[in-house]
């Protein structure tokens, strides 16, 4: 039998905590029993967190390595359904584990000879987190509303076709995004007239 940490690979060889081991164990059980076996065998996760969203609800964020994100997304709808059954209805979201490199300043410029890639900038990482969050729905538009006190509210327009699948999770998405990035976001399903 595999150990509970078989499905979790932490960066820098850290030990997974109890909650992460539980998620890893659940993924292992799914791999053993379900017809997702072939797809799940190659995949692992890097971290997992449980956060509170909107009062009493809890959500589980599972971080996966960026190269494996596409493979996870192929089976994500079924995987999420199975995991939500296991964890008694807590919403589960998959997000790729990305790194943000600091903006080069005059002082720090000499240290890093390489130019910072666009994919490691804060803006790019935050946008990518948003896209991972709402999968399988797609973002079709975005509006940023700056209020008089200069606080920002991001309105994200999601694909109307997926409204039935993701509408009940919209509050969770907002809570998770606020927790990870500190930004307020509202999701809408606009009717587009051509």
Swiss-Prot record:
Highest taxon in the source lineage: Eukaryota
Record keyword Nuclease present: no
Subunit structure, as described in the record: Component of the small ribosomal subunit.
InterPro entries per UniProt: Ribosomal_eS7, Ribosomal_eS7_CS
Cellular component terms per the entry's GO annotation: 90S preribosome; centrosome; cytosolic small ribosomal subunit; nucleus; small-subunit processome
Subcellular location: Cytoplasm, Cytoskeleton, Microtubule organizing center, Centrosome; Cytoplasm; Nucleus
Naturally occurring in which organism (per UniProt): Takifugu rubripes (Japanese pufferfish)
Name of the molecule in the record: Small ribosomal subunit protein eS7
Family: Belongs to the eukaryotic ribosomal protein eS7 family.
Pfam assignment, any one: Ribosomal_S7e
A Gene Ontology molecular function term of the record: structural constituent of ribosome
PROSITE patterns xrefs: RIBOSOMAL_S7E
Taxon lineage: Eukaryota, Metazoa, Chordata, Craniata, Vertebrata
One GO-annotated biological process of the protein: rRNA processing
